[in-house]
Amino acid sequence: MINRKSFDDQIKLDHNITYLSGSDEAGRGCLAGPLVVASVILKPDYFNPLIKDSKKLNPKTRQVLFDEIIKNCLDYQIMIISSKQVDELNPLQASLLGFKTTISNLKITPDLALIDGNQNINLENIKTLSIIKGDDNSFSIACSSILAKVTRDKILDQYDQIYPNYGFKSHKGYCTKKHLLAIQKYGVLDIHRKSYKPIKKISKETS
C-alpha cells in the first residue's frame, strides 16, 4: 500500500520546505461539462489513509472526504472552466490555466507546488514539480483530485436535472455508448465540447 503522506513528507525534507500544495483536474477527457481544477495546501499533521485517487472512491466516500479535506486544509482553490473555454483554449491549455490560476490564488504561497501529470508549468516565484500518476503517489494531489471530482460531479448532477434524456448522472459527461446514443437522438447541447471528435462527427452527421 502506497503511503502518500510519506511521499509528500519526503519531498518536504528533500527540498527543505514548509508549504507544499497539490493540484489535479477532473473532466479533461469528457465530451460535456466543465473542466475543474483544484489546488490545496493541507495542515501538516493531517492524514487519512482512505484518501487516494478520487476515481477509485465511491461517490459517498468522496463527499465525506471532500468535507474533511476542506476542514483540514490551510487553503484551497477550485476553478471551473466551461466547455466553451475548453474548446477555445484546447484541453491541455485549459488545464494549465486552471493549475496556474488556482496555485497563484492560494492565500498561502506554497514553497513547492505538486501537479498531477507530466507537463512543466512555469509560475513566477513558485516552484512546481509535475508528478506522473500524482493522485496515486502524493497525498496532497490525491486530496486535490477529490476536491475537483466532487465539484464537477455536482455540476453534472445538476445538468442531469436540466437535460434528463442524456444520462449525465451516470456517465458524468464522459464518452460512453449511452452518452453518444443520447447525443445522436436528442442533439448536441451548449455544454458539449464542440472541438472534440465524437461531437464533431455527430454534428456533421446530423447537419
Curated annotation (Swiss-Prot):
A cellular component annotation (GO) from this entry: cytoplasm
Cofactor binding notes: Manganese or magnesium. Binds 1 divalent metal ion per monomer in the absence of substrate. May bind a second metal ion after substrate binding.
GO biological process, one term: DNA replication, removal of RNA primer
Listed Gene3D superfamilies: Ribonuclease H-like superfamily/Ribonuclease H
Location of this chain's protein in the cell: Cytoplasm
Location (main, coarse): cytoplasm
Record flagged with keyword Ribonucleoprotein: no
Cytoplasm recorded as keyword: yes
Binding, a divalent metal cation: D24, E25, D116
Name of the protein: Ribonuclease HII
